[in-house]
Amino acid sequence: MRTMRWAGSLCGAAVCALLAAGCGNSSWHSLPAPQVTSVSVTVNPASITTAQTSQATATVEGIGNYSSAVTWTVSGTAGGTVSTTGLYTPATTGTATITATSTEDTTKSGSAQVTVTAVPATITVSPTTATIGTTQQFTATVSGLSSQAVTWSVAGPSGWTGSIGSISSTGLYMTPYPAPATVTVTATSVSNTSVSGSATVTLEAPATTTGPALTVDATDQLHAINPLIYGMNGYTITNNDVTQGNIPLVRWGGDATSRYNYQTNVTNSASDWYFENGQGSGGMPGAGNFTGFVSAVHSLGAEPLGTVPVLGWVSNSNASACSFPVATYPGQQSVDPYSGLCGNGVYPDGTNGCTSSGGCNIPGGSAEQARTSIAEPPPASSAATMPAASAATTSWAQSTWTGGWVNSLVTNASYGPASGGTGVNIWDLDNEPAWWDAVHRDVHPLPSTYDEVTYGGISTALAIKTIDPSAQVSGPVIDYWWNYFYSKQDIENGWGHGPCYQPWDDPTDREAHGGVPMIEYYLQQFAAAQTTYGMRLLDYVDIHGYDSATYNGASVGFATAGDTGEQEARINSTRALWDPTYTDPNLPQPNYLTDSNYTTSCNVPLQAPQLVPMLRKWVASDYPGTKTAIDEYNWGGLESINGALTQADVLGIFGQYGLDLGALWGAPTTSQVPGLMAFEIYRNYDGHDATFGDTALASCSGTAAASCDATGTNATAQNQLAVYGAVRSTDNALTVVVINKTYGALTSTLSLEGVTATGAAAVYQYSNANLNAIVAEASVPVTAPSGGASTISYTFPAQSITLFVVPQ
C-alpha cells in the first residue's frame, strides 16, 4: 500500500499551479520520501518433506513511492535454497527460516518458518497377478530410503493351510498348486526393517489350451503287466492300504529286517535307531513277528515277500541289547531319548580324539558284535567255497541259517511251501549290501565286495530253493546308481584316490572280476549257477530306485509337495525310469576304463538312467528269463495331488515298460490319501476292485499314430499328458489312463487304433476337486472309426488322472 499524506486539499500538479497563481501566498506541501514500514512472509505449505518445496510470499508495506522488491535468504537446520521468486527447496530435515529483506530498506525484513521432515519411506510391490504353474518376477519400488535393497516374503490368506509357493531373494515367485485365490507378497527394506510394502496377488489358472494328440494301439500288444508292480513295503502299511488299494504284494524288508532272528523274533534297528535289539520288526503287519506277517498279508489277499540275511549276522536273544551302550561309551553324539541307555555310536567333534565336524564313528568290532548279534554267515563267500552240486542236499540246506528258516515254514501246516498259497512267495537276498558297513557297521565294518554279495547270494538262494523249489528269489537288492556298477569296496577305494576321487579311480574289485559291472557280474554268476545246480536260483534282479530329482539341493523323494517348481521337478524326474533323453546331474555315466565313452576328465558326461529298460537290457544280455524288480522307491508328495499324479505316472511306466515287481517304500498314511488313490486308479477305481488292464498296449503322447510303436512317446508331450493303455483279459475292455501334469485344462483327442467300438466310455477321475475319492464322471461318446481308429475328445482338468474304460 502506498500512502501519501497532504496538509491541505489534494490536487493535481496543473491545478496547483493555477491555484498558486491566483491565490497569492497560499502554501504548497511537497511529496513524502519513500519509506518501507514492514515486510511479512507467508509460506505454503508450512510443513514439507525433503522431496517437496514450499512457496514463500512477501508482503511489503510502506509510504511514498517505495519498492516492493525483496531478497530471499534461508537459515536453520534444514538448510536448502530459496529462489528469487521465493521457492524454497530444503536440503535435509529440520526447520528452515525463510526471510524476505526489503531492497528499499534492508533493515526491514520478515520471516516464516518451514518444518522439513523426511520423505515417508514407502515400498510399492508389483504386479498384482500371477499365473498358477509359472514363475512371476516381482519388483519393489523403494522411496524415501537411500538403499533399494529389500527382502521378500509371501503369505497366504487367513485359514489357508496349503502351500503358498515360495519367493526367492530376488523376488522371483514360484506359484503353489493347489493355490489360494490370493497371496500377499511383501518386500521389506534391508536398511530399515520397519518399512515394507505389500501387494495382494491374485493367482489365476491358465487358460484351457489344446493338448498333444494321444494314441493307444489295441493291435500292438506289448507284454503282460505283472500285477506285482503295484506292491508296497510293509513298514507302516495298514490293512486299509492293502484292501482299499487292492495291493497284491507286501514286502518284509528294510534295514531292520537284515538281522532278524526267526528263532527268537528279535531284530536289530541298526543305525536307524541306536543299533538296538528289539522284539520283532516294528511297524509291520502281524505285530512284528515274521510268521504273523505272512498270515496277516495272506489274509488281506496279498503275497508276502520276505528278507533273509546275507551279511552274516543275526540278532541274538537279548531283546534289550544295543551295540554302543552309554555306560561303555559315554559322551556320544546322540542318545536314545526314551531309554537314555544307548547311543548312536558316534563321538562328537572335539571329544575322544575326534577332529571331524560331523563326528567320528566308534569302530565296530567283536565286542559290539557280541552284545547284539550272532554270526550266521551265508553258506559261501566266494566261488571256491560254493558247495558241489552233489553236496547241495536237503540236509545241507537245512543246516544253513536261511535253509533252516525256510524249512521251519515249509514244514509248518499253517504256512507250507510257496506253492501252497499260504507260504512265502518271494525272498529278498538281504537289503542294500552297499550300506552294510554304514547301517550295520557295528557288526559289518568293512565294505561289501563282489564275491561277498554274489556268492553269499547264490549260496543262500541255493538253500532256499533246495528246501522250497516253488519259492522265488530276488537279489541283489542294491540301491543307488554307483552301486549298480561297482562294489562298495570300489566306491570307497575311489573316495581315497585321485584325481577325481570317484569309483573309477581305484576299482580293484571290479578289475579282479573282469571289469564287469557289479549287477551284470551278479547276473552272469547266477546264470552259471543254474547250469551247475540244475535250477534257476534267481527269479528277479532287484534294485532300489531312489532316483527322484533334487530341488534346491534336496531330494524331492519322501518330501512334501512343495511349490510348483518342486512339483514339476518331482513329476519330471519319473523320466529317469524310461526316457533316453532324460539326464540327472547325480547320475553320470559309470566311466569304467573300458567303457566306450570313458574319459580321463573328472567332468564325466551324464547318462540317461532308463532304469527299467536298463534292467531289461542286463537281463537279456546276462541272464535271460530273469524278471525285474524295484522293491523300494519313493517320489514324495503323497499328501498332495502332485504326489498322486507322480505315483500314478510311476505305476503307468512300470506297466508300459515291462517291470515285473515294484514296491513303494513308505505306504500312504491317513494324511496321504492322494498317494493311495494313485494305486486305486489302477487297482480299485470303482470301489469294487475293478482294475486297469493286464496287457500293455503301445501308447503315445504327441506322436503320430502311424509311428507310435516305432518312435515311442514324445517326452515333452508325455510331460504334459501322459497316456497308458492296456486291455483287460477278463472282459476285453480297453482301459486308458491319462495324466494331465500341467496346471491348466487341456483338450485333446485320444485315438484308439484298431478299436471299432462306438457308444460310450466310462470315465473315472481323480483331481484336486476331491482328494478323498475317485469320481465316476459322465460317460463320453466314442466316435466311430475314421481311418482305422475310434476317437474320444475330452478336456482333461488341470492336475488330474482320468481313466477311460472302453467296452469292446
Predicted features by range, described:
Residues 24-206:
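Extracytoplasmic soluble-region selector
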Residues 459, 463, 527-530, 599-669, ...:
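Catalytic-core region of carbohydrate-active enzymes that cleave or remodel glycosidic bonds
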